[in-house]
UniProtKB/Swiss-Prot annotation:
This is Aminoaldehyde dehydrogenase ALDH10A9, peroxisomal. The gene is ALDH10A9. Belongs to the aldehyde dehydrogenase family. SUPFAM superfamilies: ALDH-like. Na(+) binds at residues 99, 189. Its EC number is 1.2.1.-, 1.2.1.47, 1.2.1.19, 1.2.1.8. NAD(+) binds at residues 238-245, 294, 393.
Length: 503
């Protein structure tokens, strides 16, 4: 399938702008390992221009053009963007699939979610107008008070490659709804659809500088964005190591951050489940998006009474997954995003075997695919809690397995992690599911499923999985500053100080 990759520049101040140093980066199709295009590579010089453009857009006309415009005004732009995404859905899905390797069906689903996210935050932007000047109940009748919610300012956004456009929009849509202006730095491994978002913003007439998009390396564009003194907040999705570095940079300026970082999430399967249904949700929880999901439920805890039957079916189902070029009909597992990621996944599985674990299937290149960064999904059993594959995030199609005998043991094993992003519990006993949901040390819990995500529900983790919440009303609050206004309404003087004697 011939797909034309548009040649774009950086998007700064509403204009396509060549990088100051004229650097570029190759775009590699992970299914073929071929270079299919180039993206501009921003550096600190371009970050300066983008921050200046965002700052001007925020303050233009005393903020009346954007930051202090009504939510209804901003909502019109968000809805126009959503309509354009649907209009260009096929093109955007093709670019997403060829850029990051996810199956085309998944990429198309992502585009629906992108449009839905813009629509959702358009509604919330309109609702924000009615929430201004919310009255406060004060204990003294000589005062009245109210609350103002104001955009936090210029926001820097650094986003990952597993959901290149969708996870960018999780940040862009609520920030624009709130009245912020933004600089988006997508991952250098998958930036094509984010550049097309810039083109859509240009088409709908989004005011110049409201959204600026810089592609490039994290060290050359992301780091100077995170440490820039005129960026009011940083939001980041990615590795815990990078998130820690961003926190360090922000701390020097007392700059707020929201971080959605790594995960090693558990899925607990009790012995009263429908095994076929549970097997499919277990697979979906770990192998969806080619296994490259921050919330992947990649630690399977299965009750010992059903473990043999469950694993037998799980291996058979997993071997039946269609692994192919993302554009082949019925593809359910494409390549991982890059050579580095491919080598990382293979090494994790190899190390597990060397540590004494049993590889039930996968963890190697499929025999029928001689090129591309393809990995057969791996299922690894006989793991111990000290093994690397149990404790560290693989970010690829690799599932490790342990058995348990009691509910308490399952919960203890589930929470035995430095991460706390998500967890899943599968059981027909809903009271037990409720107990386990409360016991999980995680920000997201799935009951009798794994991975469904809706823009109406909050998203984020605990422990080393980060802090702050995206999506839902919480996602909008992420970009708002709360101001309290208190007014003295009595006709009488305050009377605290004795007035000077009259002469």
């Amino acid at each position: 399938m011939a797909i034309t990759v548009p040649r774009r520049q950086l998007f700064i101040g509403g204009q396509w702008t060549e990088p100051v140093l004229r650097k570029t980066l190759p775009v590699v199709n992970p299914a073929t390992e071929d270079i299919i295009g180039y993206i501009p590579a921003a550096t600190s010089e371009d970050v300066e221009l983008a921050v200046e453009a965002a700052r001007k857009a925020f303050t233009r006309n005393n903020g009346k053009d954007w930051a202090r415009a009504t939510g209804a005004v901003r909502a019109k732009y968000l809805r126009a963007i959503a309509a354009k995404v649907i209009e260009r859905k096929s093109e955007l899905a093709n670019l997403e699939a060829i850029d990051c390797g996810k199956p085309l069906d998944e990429a198309a689903w992502d585009m629906d979610d992108v449009a839905g996210c813009f629509e959702y935050y358009a509604d919330l932007a309109e609702g924000l107008d009615a929430k201004q000047k919310t009255p406060l109940s004060l204990p003294m009748d000589t005062f009245k008070g109210y609350i103002l919610k104001e955009p936090i300012g210029v926001v820097g956004m650094i986003t990952p490659w597993n959901y290149p456009l969708l996870m960018a929009v999780w940040k862009v849509a609520p920030s624009l709804a709130a009245g912020c202006t933004a600089i988006l730095k997508p991952s250098e491994l998958a930036s094509l659809t984010c550049l097309e978002l810039a083109d859509i913003c240009r088409e709908v007439g989004l005011p110049p500088g409201v959204l600026n998009i810089l592609t490039g390396l994290g060290t050359e564009a992301g780091a100077p964005l995170a440490s820039h003194p005129h960026v009011d907040k940083i939001v980041f999705t990615g590795s815990t190591t990078t998130g820690s570095s961003i926190m360090t940079s922000a701390a020097k300026l007392v700059k707020p951050v929201s971080l959605e970082l790594g995960g090693k999430s558990p899925i607990i399967v009790f012995d009263d489940v429908d095994i076929d249904k549970a097997v499919e949700w277990t697979m979906f929880g770990c192998f969806w998006t080619n296994g490259q999901i921050c919330s992947a439920t990649s630690r399977l805890l299965v009750h010992e009474r059903i473990a043999d039957e469950f694993l037998d079916k799980l291996v058979k189902w997993t071997k039946n997954i269609k692994i192919s070029d993302p554009f082949e009909e019925g593809c359910r597992l494409g390549p991982v995003v890059s050579k580095g990621q491919y080598e990382r996944v293979l090494k994790f599985v190899s190390n597990a075997r060397n540590e004494g674990a049993t590889v039930l299937c996968g963890g190697v290149r499929p025999e029928h695919l001689k090129k591309g960064y393809f990995v057969e999904p791996a299922i690894v059993s006989n793991v111990t809690t000290s093994m690397e594959i149990w404790r560290e995030e693989v970010f690829g199609p690799a599932l490790c397995v342990k058995t348990f005998s009691t509910e308490d043991e399952a919960i203890q094993l589930a929470n035995d992690s430095q991460y706390g992003l998500a967890g899943a519990v599968l059981s027909n006993d809903l009271e037990r599911c409720d107990r386990v949901s409360k016991a999980f040390q995680a920000g997201i819990v799935w009951v009798n499923c794994s991975q469904p995500c809706f823009c109406q529900a909050p998203w984020g983790g605990t422990k080393r999985s980060g802090f702050g919440r995206e999506l839902g009303e919480w996602g909008l609050e992420n970009y708002l500053s709360v101001k309290q206004v208190t007014q003295y309404i009595s006709d009488e003087p305050w009377g605290w100080y004795k007035p000077p004697s009259k002469l």
